[in-house]
Amino acid sequence: MSSIKIECVLRENCHCGESPVWEEASNSLLFVDIPAKKVCRWDSLSKQVQRVTVDAPVSSVALRQSGGYVATVGTKFCALNWEDQSAVVLATVDKEKKNNRFNDGKVDPAGRYFAGTMAEETAPAVLERRQGSLYSLFPDHHVEKYFDQVDISNGLDWSMDHKIFYYIDSLSYSVDAFDYDLQTGKISNRRSVYKLEKEEQIPDGMCIDVEGKLWVACYNGGRVIRLDPETGKRLQTVKLPVDKTTSCCFGGKDYSEMYVTCARDGLDSKGLLQQPEAGGIFKITGLGVKGIPPYPYTG
């Protein structure tokens, strides 16, 4: 196995960086800074960052097959036009819950945009519980709701054979699996495939590799962990020089690099001194496994 290298490739000082997505066409990493209401695009060749500011906390971003991007902004699914920096609302959820916002989101293999909600936090991971739900935006722009009673809707991905949906509700301290129907988008038969250990802290964003193993960013745990969802065993731990690791994705050449987002919010002045790269973007190389390209939203 090659030696693992971790480097901070962008000192962005994100309040809460999230939702890293690799855009192969531009050799860029997309990500968001939720409370700053910014969608960012880092060009891995020029090292330049472009930013678009929206009108509410933006919690996830995804590629769109017809061009541009889609994002979850407040409680809205939006289409994002990068050139003129405009956001067009495609659908709105949780209209009766004024204190809610979207959190993590990702597009499924059929081109639906899955995303879940949560109550606004009063401090990191401190919030009114069971206020969230999981939704998906179909290509025809109608929305389906899967379930409610969610604390912090978070990481999500699909198995390589497209038969299992993996999902994290952070405060359950569990990675869950559902049977998944690619044709209809329906999910069923929820079960836990991994329970986090105490030092791993809070499960946050997640991605899958070509071997069908899950990578989970552990908020307050300063690490990403690799899990085997079939055996429930942890296979690997990669520790980072920041505590508040939030999400991860594969990207770069052949999707052999991992990009990890993290947060500064919640660190006191001492913590910020000890973790000067908090809020930055990290690249991990030498993992010896590749990821898969992100699916684009087809609506």
UniProtKB/Swiss-Prot annotation:
EC number(s) from the headed UniProt entry: 3.1.1.17
Signal peptide: none
UniProt subcellular location: Cytoplasm
Active-site positions on this chain: 204 (proton donor/acceptor)
GO biological process, one term: L-ascorbic acid biosynthetic process
Entry-linked Pfam families: SGL
Function, in words: Gluconolactonase with low activity towards other sugar lactones, including gulonolactone and galactonolactone. Catalyzes a key step in ascorbic acid (vitamin C) biosynthesis. Can also hydrolyze diisopropyl phosphorofluoridate and phenylacetate (in vitro). Calcium-binding protein. Modulates Ca(2+) signaling, and Ca(2+)-dependent cellular processes and enzyme activities.
Protein name per UniProt: Regucalcin
Species assigned in the record: Bos taurus (Bovine)
Lineage: Eukaryota, Metazoa, Chordata, Craniata, Vertebrata
